């Protein structure tokens, strides 16, 4: 679609589509709400347990999580794959950054492009009727929750036995800072639980998560389907709030894009990641 901010046509990323669909479902309500027993009054705890939850894989952007936090809605982050997302209780929407969306979890326990396309068409029709478009909605989401810019660096290997070499090296020599910002938290998912969960041996995986003082995040993990190591980068810029004007949002996006994680959207840093100099 045409992006007036960048003055060019471009394809929306999986994270951008996930944020658009997630907000739309928050605004309109779930496609097919969970059937709950309303015959007896519910305690506060029971009501909370039945409240709708939005979810995404751990390697997806944290934008949806922040939006849910702002709106007081439940959110869950899972390991990569819809076999994990489908297990989230009371999920009303779930997605992965690799273009996988579930807008009808009650009936479809997997990603489904047909229902997702229908809901996106519904959103597009509503936006056209209002005289706006998806790019402006992304700016509205940024004003509400902040700018989250994601990128990915990929290292291809010739031998599958090499897949674990990058993560092994990072375990031996973990970075103390990333892009000039101190690392404040490092998680090794072979032994640490996913954020907000308890350790479960069934959910351990070869992945490393680094969070920085600036609020940025780097995740490194071997691909589960291809001979390559993936490095997921995310930079965050706060915005003045829902009253922020378009110029303030554009400034925040430009600041994010100028940083190393944002620049990774446009450049191949495979060589630097192999040697550790990018981190």
Where are these regions (language model features)?
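Catalytic core segments in nucleotide and nucleic-acid processing enzymes
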Residues: 25
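Intrinsically disordered, low-complexity polyampholyte segments enriched for Lys and acidic residues
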Residues: 42-46
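Phosphate-binding and adjacent anionic-ligand microenvironments
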Residues: 1-10, 14, 20, 28-37, ...
